């Protein structure tokens, strides 16, 4: 059976080579394509650049080929944009033309081939899903409704760290407790639910399944089969695991959370007065026939990945930078004590009074961008960009990390220096008002979660710094900030141990 598969694959490679050469010649005459390394038949540039298309590797290619370049990865065209002007073209000026999402063999599994909001193609389904999700998740009213819960969760983290006898001596991996906090923050909004402890069996199952989903989706291991369809049979085992994880996750979401809200029956109100949490609004849209049950479950899938994990990564990066820059940590602490008073715990409304804390959040998102390439875009039809022809269904990556770390545009960008947002970059905000700084993207497909992420980051980092002196573990002068990149993610490689010495008030 393996021999037969090999023979079919080799025959397919030969036929694909012939087709690729013919198509390449025809396209070369038709299109003025962006520059890039010379592709070879079938494989394109895959053998030259490999699977690991992280932001730093793509930055090196941009230095060689320019602010826009093309990689032919098997049968897929991948266009990388690395300048503010071109980013503006993709995300704003031609936001409709480049407003779709690329397909991918693994993401197709986890999103039901685009039945969600984040990864669906641009069109009526996306507009409907965005509208349905905005009211229960992404408004100032939601922030005001749930900010007391976020403050309570941050207070619980502080209490648990204080009670931990190891925290002030040998340290603890604080990410584990912060992960529970983030699940509770979002599950309060989604389901009016929270988990009492890290040992909760349901939380353990949920965390494990979401972690496996992220690992499978963000891995570069499957690129060869995605780029080169005739090699896809070799992905059979990988894709089988993806399908099993997807089915198990969706069943868990349905059985333990969605069905519970249906049973509570709070969506029976015709004037929406009985709607208590986000999923009630989503289920109300299902009852009206606007979406189906699968759409409901894929919305839950989006929030589990896009809201929980990315914010957690940013909190972890912020803690790491504060530990490694004690003078900055002390400035945050001094500001909180001076403005709010010693012992007054940071609340969401207080953040506006704490500009240095806000600058620390912005600098964390600049230097350690959780989604450094943003979520990939796609043009459904042939398009123009930077004077070049972009073939239909090209994958467009905006290297947002390089936009925010290019020394041609930023002063000493490699330094963690929040002061830049008081000095030369005082006008720059995280909402995309400057195309050099796009931690949440901008335009039609920007991340609506910015309205939740910024206050949660401010509350969490503020509470930790005002209650503890955060230090590296004994024997270390700093904690390791090596990066772990994914398909379009960036998180810390090692979940660091942090010493948290309580302050006395």
UniProtKB/Swiss-Prot annotation:
One of its GO terms (biological process) is lignin metabolic process. Its EC number is 1.14.14.91. PROSITE patterns: CYTOCHROME_P450. It is a single-pass membrane protein. Pathway: Phenylpropanoid metabolism; trans-4-coumarate biosynthesis; trans-4-coumarate from trans-cinnamate: step 1/1. Keywords: Heme, Iron, Membrane, Metal-binding, Monooxygenase, Oxidoreductase, Transmembrane, Transmembrane helix. This is Trans-cinnamate 4-monooxygenase. It comes from Vigna radiata var. radiata (Mung bean).
